[in-house]
């Protein structure tokens, strides 16, 4: 129970929702996590290899700050140098069918998973490289 001003209660409610406190169907999300742990671990190395493929392609670019050796999972986060704009890049690649996210104004996050095969990662790498060259 929280007793406070209206402002603090509203703020606490926002924090609760941000942390998942408003979820009513948490079991559905938990079920997908269990499936991932029980059935998908055998192919996890493919996701990691695909992430490494993306990292190697991007790590060669002078506009990108990324050490491919640091990519150990299926997540690739890279930083744009100079006049880079992460949101502009995310928008540009989205228009060409590649989903990415921003992590601040200069950093972009890519995630590989079982629905993204090697050929798709190769296409995504080419699209991201071309977009960076066009934008920056």
Listing of model-derived features with the role each one plays in the protein:
Residues 1-81:
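Active-site C-terminal subdomain of aminotransferase-like
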Residues 43, 87-89:
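Extended hydrophobic-aromatic, low-complexity segments
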Residues 58-64, 92-99:
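Short amphipathic beta-strand starts and helix->beta connectors
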Residues 7, 49, 53-56, 88, ...:
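Alpha-helical scaffolding segments of alpha/beta enzyme cores, especially the outer helices
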């Amino acid at each position: 129970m929280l007793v406070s001003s209206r402002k603090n209660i509203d703020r606490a409610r926002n924090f609760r929702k941000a942390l998942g406190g408003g979820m009513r169907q948490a079991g559905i999300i938990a079920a997908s996590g269990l499936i991932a742990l029980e059935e998908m671990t055998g192919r996890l190395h493919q996701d990691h290899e695909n992430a490494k493929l993306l990292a190697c392609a991007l790590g060669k670019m002078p506009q990108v700050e990324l050490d491919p050796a640091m990519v150990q999972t299926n997540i690739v986060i890279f930083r744009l140098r100079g006049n880079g704009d992460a949101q502009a890049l995310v928008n540009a690649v989205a228009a060409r069918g590649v989903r990415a996210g921003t992590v601040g104004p200069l950093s972009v996050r890519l995630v590989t998973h079982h629905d993204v095969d090697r050929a798709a990662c190769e296409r995504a790498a080419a699209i991201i490289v071309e977009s960076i060259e066009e934008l920056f």
